Amino acid sequence: MAINIIAQLEQEESARLLAARAIPDFRPGDTLRVNVKIKEGERERVQAYEGVCIARAGTGVHESFTVRKISFGEGVERLFPLLSPSIESIEVKRRGVVRRAKLYYLRDRRGKSARIAERAGGPKASASTEA
């Protein structure tokens, strides 16, 4: 009984947070730009982190996604909680075609072998229009 109450509270909290912010529909393989609030001393600024979404995990309040980018020739991955207050916005720059839910194999690839084909319809296409 107590577990059901906790699950219900988490579901309500998740619905409340999702209604408060616009989170686009994205999947692994999509190129994202995540605008993150960074606090430096007294100042707060927004930093853009752009890369390929290689994984989504969890559900509800605990949902997270991993973004991988190459910075100065070195692979950098960052895990973001989806409903984190430090995320200002998420933009889908490019939609990719992949057949896997987790793209961890990209860690071992460089250059052309790490490319992901673009899904027809571009970033504005919704999941309902694709067949």
From Swiss-Prot:
GO cellular component, one term: cytosolic large ribosomal subunit
SUPFAM superfamilies reported for this sequence: Translation proteins SH3-like domain
Key words of the record: Ribonucleoprotein, Ribosomal protein
Swiss-Prot/TrEMBL GO biological process terms: translation
GO MF assignments: structural constituent of ribosome
Pfam family, one: Ribosomal_L19
PROSITE patterns named in the record: RIBOSOMAL_L19
Keyword DNA repair: no
Region (Disordered): 112-131
Organism domain of life: Bacteria
Gene3D superfamilies from the UniProt entry: 2.30.30.790
Role of this protein: This protein is located at the 30S-50S ribosomal subunit interface and may play a role in the structure and function of the aminoacyl-tRNA binding site.
The family this protein is said to belong to: Belongs to the bacterial ribosomal protein bL19 family.
Full protein name: Large ribosomal subunit protein bL19
